[in-house]
Amino acid sequence: MSDNNQALKDAGLKVTLPRLKILEVLQQPDCQHISAEDLYKKLIDLGEEIGLATVYRVLNQFDDAGIVTRHHFEGGKSVFELSTQHHHDHLVCLDCGEVIEFSDDIIEERQKEIAAAYNVQLTNHSLYLYGKCGDGSCKGNPDAHKRKN
């Protein structure tokens, strides 16, 4: 927990119990790409008494401080993930809503080439690919979007 205390201090935020609890939940492997509402439900399941308004406020503070990255996927709901992860892009299934993270060196290099062709030096980028399940089997099937090769 002291690492989280230091992370909050390094980000210029006061260490409070709600911030610590929210950060702990965000660090759980099953809490990547989590909405404020789902994070709130997770906190309730853990017996934490943190209001939904506080969850929204803390997530906005974390976003401003660079602790989390906010994504606006199809459907209008914001989801959050810790910013400490390596760069990756996202593939979103419009049928089931699953968000798949991927990295591809060829795509990364091509984006740099395109920017250079327009005399722009990239500082950051986001790539979101949207699609539908190839065979319609994804709803209720946790293995539907496993990488095939």
Swiss-Prot record:
> Where found in the cell?
Cytoplasm
* Record: residues binding Fe cation: H87, D89, E108, H125
Region annotated DNA-binding, chain positions:
1-84
One short Pfam name that applies is: FUR
Q: Which residues are Zn(2+)-binding?
A: H33, E81, H90, C93, C96, E101
Domain of life, per lineage: Bacteria
Q: Which terms does the record give in the GO molecular function aspect?
A: DNA-binding transcription activator activity; DNA-binding transcription repressor activity; sequence-specific DNA binding; transcription cis-regulatory region binding; zinc ion binding
SUPFAM superfamilies given in the database record: Winged helix' DNA-binding domain
InterPro entries linked:
FUR (IPR002481), Fur_C (IPR043135), WH-like_DNA-bd_sf (IPR036388), WH_DNA-bd_sf (IPR036390)
Q: Name one GO biological process term.
A: negative regulation of DNA-templated transcription
> What's the stated role of this polypeptide?
Fur acts as a repressor, employing Fe(2+) as a cofactor to bind the operator of the iron transport operon.
Q: Which family does it belong to?
A: Belongs to the Fur family.
Could you identify this protein by its name?
Ferric uptake regulation protein
Q: Which organism is it from?
A: Vibrio vulnificus (strain CMCP6)
Which gene name belongs to this protein? fur
